From Swiss-Prot:
The organism of origin for this protein: Mus musculus
Region annotation Disordered: where it falls in the sequence: 1-26, 63-109
Keyword line: Coiled coil
Keyword Iron: no
Annotated family: Belongs to the FAM167 (SEC) family.
Lineage: Eukaryota, Metazoa, Chordata, Craniata, Vertebrata
Matching InterPro entries: FAM167, FAM167_domain
Source taxon at top rank: Eukaryota
KW Transmembrane (keyword) present: no
Coiled-coil regions listed in the entry: 124-157
Name listed for the protein in its UniProt record: Protein FAM167A
Length: 215
């Protein structure tokens, strides 16, 4: 009985058809697209340590026979010792395990608490589905949090601009009152700008020190 292989393929943005858009309920893909757009990278020490440990780990994958022969010939031509071919997975087992197993095919006995391989695969699929659901929930919370932060930033900017407009309006009223009281005062020279600029409080004295918005 051969062990079934599970292949999980994820469609990237490049492989996605041109007319197909990201589903509205797929928050994980939206978060990934936003991360790539903003060029965000995690800098958590735990993640960096895990990534470094994963890169340093060597995986004894079996190589084709042609590649093994090429490596042996390269070692012989170089004058050094020939490279040892990679061992088969059964050679990596302890002597007791390899002697007990022999050449018997893989049976459907108990596998780490499971009655059969199908039961283990069903449990694995269930765990992956639950992890996928948790990822979607976290991605939805992060996207909602980002929207709330942007909304608060816009509201704060509007409040600041509204306050500056109110200050400019009060200053304009004070200058109008002073200009009525002192007609010959040099303050009247500050109103030499155009009428629309004077209505919003932009004068020669504060044109370089204030910033205004349409909020």
């Amino acid at each position: 009985m051969s062990v079934p292989q599970i292949q999980v393929e994820e469609v990237s943005e490049k492989d996605r058809p041109a007319g197909a858009a990201v589903p509205p309920d797929d928050h994980l893909l939206s978060l990934k697209a936003l991360t790539e757009k903003l060029r965000l990278e995690t800098r958590r020490p735990s993640y960096l340590e895990w990534q470094a440990r994963l890169e340093e780990q060597t995986w004894p994958f079996p190589r084709p026979a042609a590649q093994q022969e090429a490596s042996l010939e390269q070692g012989a031509c170089g004058g050094g010792e020939p490279l040892m071919p990679l061992k088969e997975p059964r050679d990596l087992l302890p002597p007791s395990a390899s002697a007990g197993r022999g050449d018997r095919p893989l049976t459907t006995g108990k596998l780490e608490g499971f009655q059969s391989i199908d039961e283990a695969i069903a449990w694995l699929r269930k765990e992956l589905a639950e992890m996928r659901l948790q990822d979607q929930q976290l991605a939805r919370q992060l996207m909602r949090l980002r929207g709330d932060i942007n909304k608060l930033k816009i509201e704060q900017t509007c409040r600041l601009h509204r306050r500056m407009l109110n200050d400019a309006a009060f200053e304009l009223e004070e200058r109008d009152e002073l200009s009525d009281l002192f007609c010959d005062s040099p303050l009247a020279s500050s109103f030499s700008l155009s009428m629309p600029l004077k209505l919003i409080g932009v004068t020669k004295m504060n044109i370089n020190s204030r910033r205004f918005s349409l909020c």
